[in-house]
């Protein structure tokens, strides 16, 4: 693999605006923060989502975005201790000391430390790839069912768009003819010496009318472009499933005895520490994309009104959605409907492994040590400088599907915040019964004495 090793740095201004990335930074010193940025692909890189070709690609990036701050300390020396050839600032003639203020800009990029060992390509077993492929295939097949149900709505929307364009154009024509007839009669009714003034008013009125039409003209232009689209002759569907493999914390601390070039400030030495914290997360995912040709304008009479009997019956079962929290059976039900009016053309399956690094670095100053005979003290003691670190290792391998994948039921736990909230609300409705227990009101029946 061809990899270029260099510093990848982003410098941001004080306003937080445009960021500039510099590459090819000279490596005069041994690199502490070693950034890798490479991208390569296989010879076959063509993929137009219609005739998918197999390809693989790899991308590695590691960047640091520093937000520097300024250290300020105050130092001084007795007048007698200053050599004659050393210039010093002007001071009060009656003072015994010469004081000055030094400031240095701090950048944490140099002390970020080595890249964590966990920032590598994740290892995925064959069983995990098989699980991801089955889940992605099932989602793609279920997405096909949804597309077929929504197909009549697309045709209806196109017909309504054409009707809207005709009505708007007819209204514009009627308004233009009415304005033309009204202004023409007004011009001939005016006296000859006033016709020039009337013509100017008519011209200004027409300009106002035209400028008032500009938003409407733009709307009609977009509607006409939509109506001119080619006829729908295919349907695309896709499914994606992701699996988090590992999440490793990253904690690195480096002691700084003296920042580079700070010794120039009259031999003053600054000590501190740099600490980097972050998380390295590894993920694996599979994306299945399928393309079907449409043989009829409407794929099946049952879907003419946006209705599919098998999926609708399953959705009418109480709490049927809970099954989708622990398996893909809800997607499997939607694949049982027969494929009427469509034929499978091509498809692809993309395997992706991702290792993402996110962290931040702070510099904490400790002491400022002046040379012998001098004194120094902090003037502004900052709380630390922040630098953001981000890294990404991503590998893609795509293969072609010549046959339609078969649905396979898999069990998995896919419970997030949304599912937990829904479960709590279901328990509250079942056991708390707020309308009866909170209000404690008995049911009222007519005829009761």
From Swiss-Prot:
Cell compartment(s), UniProt: Virion
Coiled coil: none
Mutation effect (residue 349 to Q): Associated with poor plaque morphology
A biological process term (GO) from this entry: virion attachment to host cell pilus
Subunit structure: Interacts with the host pilus.
Keywords: Host-virus interaction, Viral attachment to host cell, Viral attachment to host cell pilus, Virion, Virus entry into host cell
Family stated for the protein in its record: Belongs to the Leviviricetes maturation protein family.
Stated role: The maturation protein is required for the typical attachment of the phage to the side of the bacterial F-pili. Binds to sequences located toward each end of the genome, hence circularizing it. The RNA genome-maturation protein A complex is released from the capsid upon host receptor binding. Maturation protein A enters the cell along with the viral RNA.
InterPro entries: A_protein
Site note Essential for infectivity, residues: 360
Cellular component, GO, one term: virion component
Name of this chain's protein: Maturation protein A
